[in-house]
Regions:
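Conserved SAM-binding loop
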Residues: 14, 91, 117-118, 136
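Conserved catalytic-core motifs of GNAT/GCN5-like acyltransferases
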Residues: 117, 130, 135-153
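Conserved GNAT acetyl-CoA-binding A-motif
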Residues: 106-117, 140
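Terminal substrate-recognition subdomain of acyl/acetyltransferases
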Residues: 1-8, 146-165
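Acetyl-CoA-dependent GNAT
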Residues: 7, 16-92, 99-105, 109, ...
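Residue-level recognition of the GNAT/N-acetyltransferase active site
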Residues: 86, 90, 119-121, 146
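Short glycine/proline-centered loop/turn elements that form peptide/ligand docking sites
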Residues: 99, 121-125, 142-147
């Protein structure tokens, strides 16, 4: 996947993930995490987990999936379980757009809070989450099995955005 092309992120389209998206999602996943989810994990989330919703972010030129997210909605809480952007498209606002979409989705599902875990060493993700209103509310000791790194638990409330008057 080449960076850029004619389409910027203004042409970004976010939609529900389908099974046929998994190979492209796996490319993003494998390039993003030291211990990636498996294709069967994504299939399970899509087909068998009633709490899961999965989304992909696509660009038209060159056509392809450049980001994705997996969330669970349980009662009035949405948990972001997995969110990644293809390395060639990072630092271009893609994660911010996807996160804004997810916050709107949470509102539409009647959620009051959104939570996630993030590695303390992932400074870029921490800045993104803090910039979009998340705050650290806890720590899970030795959460990540590959490095035994702790996870920071972050949360934020969700409410309708104010529109201009």
């Amino acid at each position: 996947m080449r960076r850029g092309g004619r389409a910027g992120i203004g042409a970004l389209a976010i939609s529900g993930m389908v099974l046929e998206d998994i190979p492209a999602v796996m490319e993003v996943e494998n390039r993003s995490f030291p211990t990636p989810w498996s294709a069967s994990s994504f299939r399970h989330e899509l087909l068998e987990n009633p709490y899961a919703s999965l989304f992909v972010a696509r660009i038209p030129d060159p056509p392809g999936i450049i980001a994705f997210a997996c969330v669970w909605v349980v009662d009035e809480e949405m948990k972001i379980n997995n969110l990644a952007v293809h390395p060639l498209w990072r630092s271009r606002g893609v994660a911010t757009r996807l996160l804004e979409f997810l916050l709107d989705f949470a509102l539409g599902q009647g959620c009051r809070e959104v939570t996630l875990e993030v590695r303390p060493s992932n400074a870029v993700a921490l800045r993104l989450y803090q910039r979009t209103g998340f705050a650290v509310v806890g720590r899970r000791k030795r959460y990540y099995t590959d490095t035994h790194e702790d996870a920071l638990v972050m949360a934020r409330s969700v409410h309708p955005r104010k529109t201009g008057s």
